[in-house]
Amino acid sequence: MMKIIIFLIVSSLVLIGVKTDNGYLLDKYTGCKVWCVINNESCNSECKIRRGNYGYCYFWKLACYCEGAPKSELWHYETNKCNGRM
């Protein structure tokens, strides 16, 4: 019985790890990255609202970077629909 419980815990942790990722937050309205200048608090709040662990403003890219968020909440180069809009 104890082995089954341990197996279930480990399996659930693996599944949680597979469904989350790190990356730039996606503005679903524009298809662009969520932009910022130096406001880590804003990015962290937005990241947590989207079920991420921690977010910050990546200064060189002027975009909010989020760790541990679901992949559906993140911007991906392959599916970029921004076309230079803000």
From Swiss-Prot:
Positions of the LCN-type CS-alpha/beta domain: 21-83
Q: In which tissues is it expressed?
A: Expressed by the venom gland.
Keywords tagged on the record: Antibiotic, Antimicrobial, Calcium-activated potassium channel impairing toxin, Disulfide bond, Ion channel impairing toxin, Neurotoxin, Potassium channel impairing toxin, Secreted, Signal, Toxin, Voltage-gated sodium channel impairing toxin
Q: Which domain of life is it from?
A: Eukaryota
Q: Which residues form the signal peptide?
A: 1-20
- Give the matching Gene3D superfamilies: Knottin, scorpion toxin-like
SMART domains, alphabetized: Knot1
Mention one GO molecular function: potassium channel regulator activity
Q: What is its main location?
A: secreted
Protein name stated in the entry:
MeuNaTxbeta-1
Give the species this sequence originates from.
Mesobuthus eupeus
